[in-house]
Amino acid sequence: MEFTTRTIAARKHIALVAHDHRKQALLAWVEDNKSVLEQHQLYATGTTGNLIQQASGIPVNSMLSGPMGGDQQVGALIAEGKIDMLIFFWDPLNAVPHDPDVKALLRLATVWNIPVATNRSTADFLIDSSLFKSEVEIAIPDYQRYLQDRLK
């Protein structure tokens, strides 16, 4: 696979996702980081996004609820280069009916090389990083070259 670069702007497009048993933890994290997060563009799965917007007043672009396709919508935005970072407080102790969607979401975040936080500690590390406030170049798959090679 060949790679190219993509610029992540200083103003990030951040996806926020949380399983039911982790929503309160994500809401607390958002509240603790409200002054930073409100400077960025937020996206979320349906229930999570609405809860964040109600609790914090920060505008959130909400997708469908995760089990109804919201995880896949966020994944599509990642593949389109429209999401720069994923904060996903997932619940490792409880299975969810849309587990394949969760795996696909994490796979896409990895394929497209965006930062991912899966708990409060990693989310704190990301938001406190000097890179969070800066424009950053990341390596991403060169899809056009990939497609050309596949069509030969």
UniProtKB/Swiss-Prot annotation:
Residues holding substrate: H19, K23, T45, G46, T47, T48, S65, G66, H98
Amino-acid biosynthesis in keyword set: no
A single BP term in Gene Ontology: methylglyoxal biosynthetic process
Matching CDD domains: MGS
Keywords: Lyase
Cross-referenced Pfam families: MGS
Transmembrane feature ranges: none
Domain MGS-like: 6-152
GO molecular-function term, one example from the UniProt record: methylglyoxal synthase activity
Gene Ontology CC: cytosol
Catalytic activity field: dihydroxyacetone phosphate = methylglyoxal + phosphate
Active site per UniProt: D71
Function comment: Catalyzes the formation of methylglyoxal from dihydroxyacetone phosphate.
PANTHER family associated with the record: METHYLGLYOXAL SYNTHASE
HAMAP family: Methylglyoxal_synth
UniProt similarity note: Belongs to the methylglyoxal synthase family.
Name of the protein this chain belongs to: Methylglyoxal synthase
Gene: mgsA
